[in-house]
Amino acid sequence: MKKNNERVNTNPSLISKSYNMKKRPVIGTRRHFARKEIESDSDDEDDIFLAGERKKYLQNQSYERRKQKNEHGNNLTLQEELLRHEAYEKNEEIANENDVDQVNLMKYFVHMDNISPVTTNGSLKESLRKYSSIIAVNIFSETGDLKKGIAIFQDLSDAEQAVQYLSNCKIDGRLISATITNHPKRLPNAEHLESSTKTKDESQDKDKLTKLDRAKLEWLIQGLNCEKGSIGNLLCFAVEHVNNHVEITDAFLKEFFNDQPTDDTKVYDDDYINERGEKKLSLIYLMNDILFNGISGTSLVWRYRFSFEPHVERLLDDLYLFSKRLGGRIKEDIFCKKVVKVIEVWKTWIAFQEETLERAWRNFSGNTPQSPQINSAALKVETKNSWTAISEETEGLQDDEEYNGIPVDVNELLNVEFISQIPMSTETSSSSSPQPTEERKAKFKPSFTQGTFVSKRMRMHAEDLF
C-alpha cells in the first residue's frame, strides 16, 4: 500500500506538468492498463484513481470553454448570432459547444419598423438598456425615409415590455412599431440585398451562353449544310447546352430568316439562292433531329419544342415563299418534296398544331386531302395546256439528262427532223412519231419513242459516223 500511496502523491504533479506541456491527456493511460504495460497491486484502486483524474480533466476543459466564451462572446456581431440561431433551428452541425451556448441565449426577437432616419444604434440601445436581458440591437440600412431594426432578448417579459415602450414612447420624434417572434426574419439589410442581387445575376448568367460557347455556336451555324456530320455537330451542341435553349433557338431563327445578303448584287444570284436553300433545309433537318431526341427521352431536350412552336407557322410560310425563288420547276419540286417528308414526320409525331402542319402540307404537296377524287378530264386539259405553254418557251433546250443519256439512232433523227421546227403537244407528237421497220430494229422501245420530243443535241453511235 505504501507504493500505491507514494504513486498517488507523486502523480498529480506529473499530470499538471503534462497539461502545461500539452501532452496527451491522462485518459489515454487506461489503455496502458489494459495492455498490462504498468503493473499494479489492485485494479480497483487504479480504476478509482483514473476516474478521479478523468473528472478533473473534464472540469478543466469545461472551464477553458467557459473562459473562451466570456472572452469572445461580446465580440460577436449580430449577423453571426442570427446565422448561428438559424443553424440551430435547422439542426445543422455547429462547430463547437460555444456556438450552442451562444444560440441558447437568443430566444426572443423584436422586429422594429418605422424607425427615424436620425436614430442610430447607440441611441436606440440607450433607450432599451433598462431591460437587463437584452443581448443585441441593430438598425439596418434605410429603405426610403424609413429604417428597420432588430433587438434580441433573453427574457420574454423584457421583450414584451420593450414592445410596449416602443409603441407608446417616441424615439427621435417617431413611434416604432414592434413585433415579437422566436425566430429571426430575413431583413432587407444591405448585405442581404447584395446577396439577392448576386443570386439573380448568377441565375441570369446560367441562362446565357459564355462568350466562347456563343462564338462556337455562331461558327457551327455559319458552316451548317445538309451533311450528316455538320448537322450532328450542331445537334450535340444543342443537347449539351439545353439550359440555354432560348438563346440557341433565337440563333437558329435569326440565321433562318436572314435572307438579305451582305452584297446587294447577290439578291438574284443563283449560287446565293441555292446556298440559302441548302441552309434552310439543313436547319429544318436540325429541328427534326432535336424533336426526335426530345421524344426519345433525352434529358430536357423537350424544352426546344416549346421554343420552336410559336415560330413554326412563320417558318413554313417562309419556306414556301422561298421555293418560288429557286428559278425552275424541277428545283422547286425537289425542294418541296424534301420539306413534305419532314412535315409528314411531324404530323405522325403530333409535334406541333395539326392545322398548321396540314396547311403547310397542302402548300408544298399541291394536294387537297378533303377531295381525294379528282376529275380526270379536267386534269388532262390542265396538264395539256401547261405543257404546251412550257414547250413554246423551252423549245430546243432539251438536255440529255431527261433521257438518261441514251443515244438516238441517226435514221430516226433524220426522219423526225421536221418535227423540231414545230412546237408539238403530247397528242400530235405521238401520232407523228415514226414506227420502226423490220429491216433495221429501232434503238428505242415503242413505248419510249411515242409521245416524246427528240432533241437534235443527242449524240450518235460511232458506227453511224462512217
UniProtKB/Swiss-Prot annotation:
<keyword id="KW-0539">Nucleus</keyword>
<feature type="domain" description="RRM">
    <location>
        <begin position="108"/>
        <end position="183"/>
    </location>
</feature>
<dbReference type="GO" id="GO:0003723">
    <property type="term" value="F:RNA binding"/>
</dbReference>
<dbReference type="InterPro" id="IPR012677">
    <property type="entry name" value="Nucleotide-bd_a/b_plait_sf"/>
</dbReference>
<feature type="compositionally biased region" description="Basic and acidic residues">
    <location>
        <begin position="188"/>
        <end position="207"/>
    </location>
</feature>
<feature type="modified residue" description="Phosphoserine">
    <location>
        <position position="371"/>
    </location>
</feature>
<feature type="modified residue" description="Phosphoserine">
    <location>
        <position position="42"/>
    </location>
</feature>
<dbReference type="Pfam" id="PF04818">
    <property type="entry name" value="CID"/>
</dbReference>
<dbReference type="GO" id="GO:0045292">
    <property type="term" value="P:mRNA cis splicing, via spliceosome"/>
</dbReference>
<dbReference type="InterPro" id="IPR051485">
    <property type="entry name" value="SR-CTD_assoc_factor"/>
</dbReference>
<dbReference type="GO" id="GO:0005634">
    <property type="term" value="C:nucleus"/>
</dbReference>
<dbReference type="InterPro" id="IPR008942">
    <property type="entry name" value="ENTH_VHS"/>
</dbReference>
<keyword id="KW-0597">Phosphoprotein</keyword>
<dbReference type="GO" id="GO:0005686">
    <property type="term" value="C:U2 snRNP"/>
</dbReference>
<dbReference type="Pfam" id="PF00076">
    <property type="entry name" value="RRM_1"/>
</dbReference>
<feature type="modified residue" description="Phosphoserine">
    <location>
        <position position="40"/>
    </location>
</feature>
<feature type="compositionally biased region" description="Low complexity">
    <location>
        <begin position="425"/>
        <end position="436"/>
    </location>
</feature>
<feature type="region of interest" description="Disordered">
    <location>
        <begin position="1"/>
        <end position="22"/>
    </location>
</feature>
<feature type="region of interest" description="Disordered">
    <location>
        <begin position="425"/>
        <end position="448"/>
    </location>
</feature>
<feature type="compositionally biased region" description="Polar residues">
    <location>
        <begin position="7"/>
        <end position="19"/>
    </location>
</feature>
<feature type="domain" description="CID">
    <location>
        <begin position="209"/>
        <end position="368"/>
    </location>
</feature>
<keyword id="KW-0963">Cytoplasm</keyword>
<protein>
    <recommendedName>
        <fullName>Uncharacterized protein C11C11.01</fullName>
    </recommendedName>
</protein>
<feature type="region of interest" description="Disordered">
    <location>
        <begin position="186"/>
        <end position="207"/>
    </location>
</feature>
<dbReference type="InterPro" id="IPR035979">
    <property type="entry name" value="RBD_domain_sf"/>
</dbReference>
<dbReference type="GO" id="GO:0005829">
    <property type="term" value="C:cytosol"/>
</dbReference>
<dbReference type="InterPro" id="IPR006569">
    <property type="entry name" value="CID_dom"/>
</dbReference>
<dbReference type="InterPro" id="IPR000504">
    <property type="entry name" value="RRM_dom"/>
</dbReference>
<keyword id="KW-0694">RNA-binding</keyword>
